């Protein structure tokens, strides 16, 4: 019995030792697999050494427990020997992989060549300590709980990602100067550019963002910032096996927005790359184009995480299949958030607008493409908070903030738009559905003039819960030809109802994989701010086909002065969506906010205005005398356009004047405001209420809406109503003066440094500025910065020593979207 007990005591530790050895071998094998097949999300760098991956059994040996026989030690040693063999095999693979990776690295330019590169304004910002505190606007949030992760720490070497297949040399460079580059691209080869430029196809056929461009005298404007995947220019077919393109610098002014917001900094091309140097050899040393040729992501001087915009094979085949329907196409694109709906819709749109002549159906698009955007959070051709129907006639190449509105007859126009007042339709699903149905009716009316006009519907990522009910209802009601769902991972509780609705509507359901690797340098909220800022700073001169951006801050922009009371009253009322507010608070709610300018087309323009009571308040309504009639328009830009009266009595019955400011508060509803009927109203655009002048009873509105659009609405006897929704606060407008002042001071310091350098090289003292004058100008600029920083809701960080290091670390960080695929995940995190 004693011997048996000793055997049992000696055998007791055996299972634990076996489990430990088995776990160690599994960890080593998993590490070996991870080394041989690195994931796409990880940076491709030299694998860690053997020492860094020491297994538990490779650590310092521990003495065996008392009473453990030597036989068990021998068995463990045998397993350790097996583990060491596995380690040697792993180490051999690591060395082989490291050698292969080293051989694949391109030859780096010498430090002297890097010093010879010209510096841009953004690069000088990086060298000046004054810039570090300006990056506060893009600081990531820690511990986000709404479906997003903090930026991945990529302090190690940046992954060298291949971008262009074409390498420029003397044989494929036709001509070049400091503004233009003409190259020859062989078939199935590609070229990737960073920046913004005009593209001219001279010979052959090239594809860009889904569009096939044939030789023509037309120039295509392309915007390729680092905030999105870079467009790839690929040769589809050519003459003598190659296509010939000319790329030219363009000066649209969009790069000037970096002086107004840190979100627009470091998104365009930096220093000249090796390819740029090759094509600028005969140009001055300071020459710099608005675009740069990139072979790999390592060519970027800012060391950003750049990726090319490539399509999945399933995406390409689906786009070709859908395009063959021609004018009969009516496709709804839906799926979870961050699944690539907008990218797929943009590719399909461009492909339809530029079909290849050799298509099987011989379809030639002359009627354009209708684009029904039902995503108010991230719209393609309008600022946030709107759903709209657009009629496109030309492909578009760029992110949404490069075309925040459509007013060009050449590119396309907005047929009709409705203001939802929020970035998600879940705030008022009924109003959202009514707006979608009205826009669909407008598309059917558009078919009378353009019978071969296909339709693309972009549905938001609100696909769970109530959003799924809305999506299935739209599938059954809109008479679609196709439904595309952008996720192969389901979930089944979404795919099954969607498939049943598509089957009832006799529309095939196509399931595609979602967009891979969602690494972005700007969050969704930041991209909305960029798009909104671009919307307010963009202008379209009549004599120029492409838009221009002005760098003047909103506070210095000439506003529209609109009377809200009196004989020249220009607006019918002010509506606040959502819950009822006290009229005393209307000025605070309205001042400094973003409002929609809505044209009321019918007396019955408010939903439910005959069903429920109007506004219930504690203050008595002010009597409306002869000076507060709504018969006349405002002085600018609608002065002199008489209004008729059919709409006035119906709106006047629901207007309450605020006791102090005499603002016209329009409210219909019971507890919450009833929205305007989409069938009897349309949104003309957005405006920023810069101030409310109570003494003159006027509003100062800053808006990019053309005065002719408002004048046309008034000539048709349509009343103007300002609608205050639940959009993001215009923080970008508050801080514009501060960033503009810092940019002005930076430019002045750079000019002084340039003069000092010229003085040292030329020994001329004529251009020297007196020290007293320098001090006086510097004091004026610093005072301007101080005054610009003394505004509410903005904190200026004066001590930038630690903040600058954080900003440098953020430049090496990425935002990683964590996709949720379960019911109830329709909420988007506030980054």
UniProtKB/Swiss-Prot annotation:
Residues 79-97 have a biased composition (Basic and acidic residues). One of its GO terms (cellular component) is nucleolus. Residues 1-161 are annotated as: Disordered. One of its GO terms (biological process) is cleavage in ITS2 between 5.8S rRNA and LSU-rRNA of tricistronic rRNA transcript (SSU-rRNA, 5.8S rRNA, LSU-rRNA). Residues 8-37 have a biased composition (Low complexity). Gene3D superfamilies: P-loop containing nucleotide triphosphate hydrolases. InterPro entries: Clp1/Grc3 (IPR045116), CLP1_P (IPR032319), P-loop_NTPase (IPR027417). It holds the Pfam family CLP1_P. Signal peptide: none annotated. It is found in: Nucleus, Nucleolus. ATP binds at residues 335-342. Residues 113-126 have a biased composition (Acidic residues). Its EC number is 2.7.1.-. One of its GO terms (molecular function) is polynucleotide 5'-hydroxyl-kinase activity. Keywords: ATP-binding, Kinase, Nucleotide-binding, Nucleus, rRNA processing, Transferase. Its main location: nucleus. Belongs to the Clp1 family. NOL9/GRC3 subfamily. Polynucleotide 5'-kinase involved in rRNA processing. This is Polynucleotide 5'-hydroxyl-kinase grc3. The gene is grc3.
């Amino acid at each position: 019995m004693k011997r048996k007990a000793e055997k049992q005591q000696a055998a007791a530790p055996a299972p634990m030792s076996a489990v430990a050895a088995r776990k160690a071998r599994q960890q080593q094998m998993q590490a070996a697999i991870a080394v041989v097949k690195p994931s796409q999300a990880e940076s491709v760098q030299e694998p860690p050494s053997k020492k860094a991956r020491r297994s538990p059994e490779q650590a310092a040996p521990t003495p065996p427990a008392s009473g453990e026989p030597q036989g068990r030690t021998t068995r463990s040693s045998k397993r350790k020997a097996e583990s060491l063999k596995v380690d040697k095999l792993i180490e051999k693979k690591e060395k082989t992989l490291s050698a292969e990776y080293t051989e694949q690295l391109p030859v780096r330019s010498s430090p002297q060549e890097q010093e010879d590169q010209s510096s841009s304004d953004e690069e000088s910002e990086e060298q000046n300590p004054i810039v570090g505190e300006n990056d506060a606007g893009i600081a990531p949030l820690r511990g986000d709980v709404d479906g997003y992760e903090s930026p991945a720490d990529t302090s190690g070497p940046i992954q060298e990602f291949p971008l262009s297949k074409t390498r420029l040399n003397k044989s494929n460079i036709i001509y070049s100067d400091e503004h233009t580059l003409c190259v020859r691209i062989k078939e199935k080869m590609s070229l990737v550019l960073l920046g913004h430029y005009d593209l001219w196809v001279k010979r052959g056929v090239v594809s860009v963002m889904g569009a096939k461009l044939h030789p023509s005298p037309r120039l295509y404007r392309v915007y390729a910032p680092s905030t999105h995947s870079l467009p790839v220019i690929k040769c589809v077919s050519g003459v003598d096996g190659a296509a010939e393109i000319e790329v030219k610098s363009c000066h649209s002014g969009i790069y000037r927005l970096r002086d107004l917001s840190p979100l627009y900094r470091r998104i365009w091309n930096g220093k000249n790359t090796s390819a740029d140097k090759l094509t600028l050899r005969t140009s001055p040393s300071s020459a710099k184009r608005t675009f740069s040729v990139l072979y790999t992501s390592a060519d970027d001087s800012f060391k950003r995480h750049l990726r090319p915009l490539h399509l999945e094979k399933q995406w390409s085949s689906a786009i070709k299949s859908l395009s063959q329907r021609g004018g009969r196409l009516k496709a709804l694109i839906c799926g979870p958030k961050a699944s690539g709906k907008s990218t797929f819709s943009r590719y399909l749109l461009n492909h339809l607008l530029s079909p290849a002549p050799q298509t099987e159906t011989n379809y030639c698009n002359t009627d354009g493409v209708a684009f029904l955007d039902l995503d108010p959070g991230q719209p393609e051709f309008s600022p946030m908070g709107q759903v709209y129907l657009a009629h496109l006639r030309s492909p578009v190449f760029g992110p949404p903030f490069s075309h925040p509105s459509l007013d060009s007859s050449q590119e396309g126009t907005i047929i009709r738009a409705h203001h939802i007042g929020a970035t998600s339709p879940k705030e008022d699903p009924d109003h959202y559905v009514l707006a979608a149905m009205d826009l669909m009716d407008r598309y059917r009316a558009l078919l009378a003039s353009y019978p071969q006009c296909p339709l693309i519907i972009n549905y938001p990522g609100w696909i769970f819960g109530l959003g799924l009910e809305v999506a299935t209802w739209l599938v059954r009601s809109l008479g679609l030809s196709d439904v595309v769902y952008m996720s192969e991972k389901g979930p089944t509780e979404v795919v099954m109802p969607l498939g049943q609705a598509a089957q009832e509507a006799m529309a095939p359901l196509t399931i595609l994989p979602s967009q891979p690797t969602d690494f972005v340098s700007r969050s969704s909220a930041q991209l909305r701010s960029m798009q909104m800022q671009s919307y307010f700073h963009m202008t379209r001169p009549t004599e120029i086909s492409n838009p221009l951006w002005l760098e003047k801050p909103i506070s210095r922009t000439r506003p529209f002065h609109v009377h809200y009371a009196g004989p020249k009253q220009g607006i019918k009322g002010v509506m606040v969506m959502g819950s009822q507010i006290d009229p005393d608070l209307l000025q605070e709610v309205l001042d400094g906010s973003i409002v929609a300018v809505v044209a009321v087309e019918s007396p019955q323009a408010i939903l439910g205005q005959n069903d429920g009571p109007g506004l219930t308040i504690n203050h008595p309504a002010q009597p409306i005398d002869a000076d507060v009639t709504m018969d006349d328009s405002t002085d600018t830009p609608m002065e002199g356009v008489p209004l008729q009266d059919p709409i006035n009595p119906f709106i006047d019955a629901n207007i309450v004047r605020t006791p102090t400011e005499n603002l016209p508060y329009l409210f219909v509803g019971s507890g919450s405001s009833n929205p305007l009927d989409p069938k009897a109203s349309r949104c003309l655009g957005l405006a920023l209420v810069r101030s409310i002048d109570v003494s003159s009873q006027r509003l100062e509105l800053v808006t990019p809406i053309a005065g002719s659009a408002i004048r046309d609405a008034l000539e048709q006897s349509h009343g103007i109503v300002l609608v205050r929704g639940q959009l993001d606060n215009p923080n970008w407008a508050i801080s514009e003066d501060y960033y503009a002042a810092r940019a002005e001071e930076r430019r002045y310091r750079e000019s002084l440094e340039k003069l000092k350098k010229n003085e040292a090289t030329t020994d001329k003292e004529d251009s020297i500025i007196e020290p007293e004058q320098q001090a006086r100008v510097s004091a004026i600029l610093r005072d301007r910065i101080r005054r610009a920083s003394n505004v509410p809701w903005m904190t200026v960080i004066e001590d930038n020593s630690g903040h600058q290091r954080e900003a440098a670390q953020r430049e090496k960080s990425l935002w990683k979207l964590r996709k949720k695929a379960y019911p109830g995940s329709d909420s988007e995190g506030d980054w």
